[in-house]
């Protein structure tokens, strides 16, 4: 997937020098979806890490084999990297990355959390059926690019694996 490469940038002189920012991308997305925001923070002097979550930035078939535990597993080492290099660390999460940001803030020491359109639950009764549906229906139509800006698209999967959606629901229960 184009732009899926993780972001690892050490801090430099600027107004945010000494700050470390861990950025968590969303479900079926990749660092491509937060690259512009991350670059702004880097330009301001912050050290920024946006890891590629396991099963993301590849194919929906690979995502289908991962769980929220796998997605979370890359965050503590990224936060450790920032902690070694910066005075203060914050976490930013986009969509499902918001749930991951909340989870790491529950378990690790961070100075702050910023959530952008966080995915932390739904009122849809259909979601209660996802664990059962995942056993007979492996995927549904993917979220796709939901950016409204003209000419801007977000790389994403054409299909969403229901097993991964079910795991995301488990993550929601941990953070809400």
Task: Specify the residue positions occupied by each region the protein language model found.
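Short beta-strand-to-loop junctions in surface cap/lid or active-site-entrance loops
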Residues: 1-19
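The conserved beta1-alpha1 loop
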Residues: 22-28
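The serine-hydrolase catalytic nucleophile loop
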Residues: 28-39
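Conserved alpha/beta-hydrolase
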Residues: 38-60
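Catalytic nucleophile-loop/oxyanion-hole region of alpha/beta-hydrolase
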Residues: 59-85
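Gly/Ala-rich beta-loop-alpha elbow adjacent to hydrolase catalytic centers
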Residues: 93-97, 101
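The alpha/beta-hydrolase serine catalytic core
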Residues: 111-112, 118-176
